[in-house]
Design a protein with these regions (language model features):
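Buried, small/hydrophobic-residue-enriched core segments of structured protein domains
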Residues: 1-175, 195-197
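Acidic, Ser/Thr-rich peripheral helices and adjacent loops at domain boundaries
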Residues: 90-110, 232-254
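Short beta-strand/loop segments at the ligand-binding rim of alpha/beta enzyme cores
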Residues: 171, 180-187, 214
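Glycine-rich beta-to-alpha transition loops that act as phosphate-gripper elements at the mouths
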Residues: 187-195, 219-223
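Glycine-rich phosphate-binding active-site loops on the catalytic face of alpha/beta enzymes
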Residues: 208-235
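An anionic, glycine-rich sequence signature occurring as long contiguous blocks
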Residues: 239-282
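Extended hydrophobic packing segments that form well-structured cores
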Residues: 264-317
Length: 317
């Protein structure tokens, strides 16, 4: 299994300018040289998760299908239910006409905007609906106007990971008739999984005709007692590496959740007059040495020895 610091290091080592090409080359190396067989999990949301699924996985399909083992796709950000199962669209097939289905969608849509659009399902076909609202002098809705109705093809984000993987790699059906991904591929999700979310995911997969065994959950502290490293705001992260004398920034910047952006490259920590600290990202080697950070370990050697008592005293200052 891989995690973000090692993964982003590999991506930027192969191609720091073109992240998609760098990730393609890095993953190909992992699949063919490092882990040519067996169970292999890869975190795929470091930069562009949906771009990874849409462009990189199809390119590596033959390699994945020829491996003696299972390749596991791992997203780690975004709306967990939508990432796994895709978006949920309301079926208005009970309406007598497509136009009345569009109006029903407008009535159900909760918004203060005068123009909005959305996607509905009608008679096994998806449609994109564009609506305008007319209002009276009091600002209350007077009427809905259907501007456009166009046939709509679901995007990769609309379908979600499981359906998209099935489209690419195919699969079989269980004895109960549910779709099961090919044995060479599956997915895992372990970020913020609760019992309630797990149940919602299984229900959505059931509605779409997919077996629950297409996804594995990583269940840890959040599910058990909702205490994690984030409870104290503490984590240890790699932000920079030197490979063949080359400085390589290590950072993630997932499109699926900008709040998970990490620190990048060499860091300079500045102590302000009020005692607070400011961190500067991706600085030069010279700038990094001017900050408050002090080397503790280097090349396997302990450079600064402190007792726990000294560390506790520093924390409480």
């Amino acid at each position: 299994a891989g995690e973000h610091s090692v993964t982003t290091l590999g991506i930027n080592y192969y191609n720091a300018e073109d992240k998609q090409q760098g990730e393609l080359e890095y993953l190909k190396w992992l699949l063919t040289e490092v882990q040519p067989s067996g169970l292999f999990s890869y975190v795929a949301d470091s930069y562009d998760y949906w771009g990874f699924l849409e462009h990189i996985l199809p390119t590596l399909k033959d390699i994945i299908m020829s491996r003696d083992g299972k390749y596991v796709v791992r997203p780690d950000s975004g709306n967990v239910i939508d990432v796994i199962c895709g978006k949920e669209f309301i079926d208005y097939s009970e309406e007598p006409t497509l136009h009345s289905a569009a109006l029903r969608f407008a009535y159900d849509y909760e918004t203060q905007e005068n123009n909005f659009e959305g996607v509905i399902l009608y008679q096994k076909q998806y449609y994109k609906i564009s609506i305008s609202v007319t209002r009276n002098k009091l600002g209350l809705i007077d009427n809905y106007i259907v501007n456009r109705i166009d046939e709509y093809d679901l995007t990769i984000e609309d379908k979600g990971t499981v359906e998209w993987l099935y489209d690419i790699f195919g699969g079989t059906k269980t004895e109960q008739g549910y779709k099961l991904l090919d044995s060479h591929i599956c997915m895992i999700y372990g970020d913020g999984i609760t019992y309630e979310r797990a149940e919602q995911i299984f229900n959505r997969l059931h509605e779409k005709g997919f077996a629950s065994t297409n996804v594995v959950f990583g269940i840890g502290s959040w599910t058990m007692n909702q205490v994690s490293r984030d409870s104290l705001g503490i984590a240890v992260k790699a932000t920079n590496a030197i490979v063949n004398d080359k400085q390589i920034p290590i950072y993630k910047q997932p499109k699926t959740d900008s709040t998970k952006n990490s620190a990048k490259g060499l860091l300079k920590v500045i102590k302000n007059e009020d005692g607070s600290y400011t961190t500067l990202n991706n600085v030069t080697v010279e700038e990094e040495q001017q900050g408050e950070l002090v080397s503790v370990f280097k090349d396997g050697k302990l450079l600064r020895e402190q007792t726990f008592e000294e560390i506790r005293n520093l924390i409480w200052k």
